[in-house]
A protein has these predicted regions:
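N-terminal, membrane-interfacial amphipathic/helix-forming hydrophobic leader that caps
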Residues: 1-86, 196, 202-203, 221-271
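Alpha-helical transmembrane segments
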Residues: 8-24, 98-110, 162-166
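Juxtamembrane helix-loop-helix connectors linking adjacent transmembrane helices
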Residues: 36-42, 46-60, 64-66, 76-141, ...
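Transmembrane helix-loop-helix hairpins at the membrane interface
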Residues: 122-265
């Protein structure tokens, strides 16, 4: 597997993406959409929304959450098999000064939340956060961890573009086969464009964790925010064109790209 991944990195990445697309249908078979007949025959309890822990468990029992949980398991299993833990970014950020590069995505998060939060209580917030966390961990481990490590030997800019493209294609394929095309295109665009910023952070901080932090914070903010018309348009602009531009800015020339890498270089041992 490692020989194939290193010898044919692009085909390896396409194969993993296609495998995940197939897993989508397995997850939908596990949690099928139940057809609704005569609602008058349903018990009253059916119409009572769950509360507390019941709400959290109910929201987590979904095809999407199962899909990303399986993606996490697949990514970790392949990283263990290939031994790519350090190269995939499972290390401490060695470029601590570059943590300031999180400022722009976190500023977008703050803008997203500027109109307030729409929630029915702490349980709903916890449920949304856990669902978002599983999804962002799955996407980052696969695309900015495993696939990034396979592609980055050809340069960080190429790795950013290809991993973002594959992530966007996976999202549009999964969403378009189960929902309306406009929503699929919107989510795919956010995924593709966000990948530029998360991938650039991955390179500049030498770790996967800052990207996970930024991705989770933004996805959670979008999930709970109350967006007005103007704020919505501004957030969409910043999280698409803005994230692409920011990611390319962080990797704009060889001297800037040199301030980053896969992992922290090990100091030589003097004997």
């Amino acid at each position: 597997m490692r020989r194939f991944a290193e010898g044919r990195p692009f085909y390896f990445c396409v194969l993993i993406t296609l495998l995940l697309f197939g897993v989508t249908f397995l997850c939908r078979a596990v949690f099928p959409k139940a057809p609704v007949g005569n609602i008058a025959k349903l018990p009253q309890k059916t119409f009572e929304p769950p509360e507390g822990l019941g709400l959290i468990l109910s929201d987590l029992k979904s095809p999407d959450t199962l899909f990303w949980a399986l993606a996490i398991a697949l990514g970790l299993a392949l990283l263990a098999w290939t031994g790519w833990w350090a190269g995939a970014g499972f290390t401490r950020p060695s470029r601590w000064r570059n943590m300031r590069l999180l400022a722009f995505p976190l500023l977008v998060c703050a803008l997203t939340l500027s109109g307030g939060v729409f929630t029915s209580g702490p349980a709903a917030l916890a449920s949304t956060f856990l669902a978002v966390l599983v999804a962002t961990l799955g996407e980052e481990i696969i695309f900015r961890g495993l696939l990034w490590r396979a592609l980055v030997q050809q340069g960080p800019v190429r790795a950013v573009i290809l991993t973002s493209l594959l992530a966007g294609l996976l999202v549009i394929g999964r969403t378009a086969t189960d929902g309306p095309w406009p929503e699929a295109v919107r989510l795919a665009a956010l995924t593709f464009c966000g990948g530029f910023t998360y991938g650039a952070l991955r390179w500049r901080t030498t770790s996967i964790w800052p990207g996970i932090l930024a991705h989770t914070a933004f996805a959670f903010a979008v999930g709970v925010a109350t967006l007005g018309t103007l704020t919505f348009r501004l957030v969409i602009l910043l999280s698409t064109v803005g994230f692409v531009a920011y990611g390319l800015y962080l990797l704009r020339n060889p001297s800037v790209r040199a301030n980053g890498g896969l992992t922290k270089p090990r100091p030589s041992r003097v004997r």
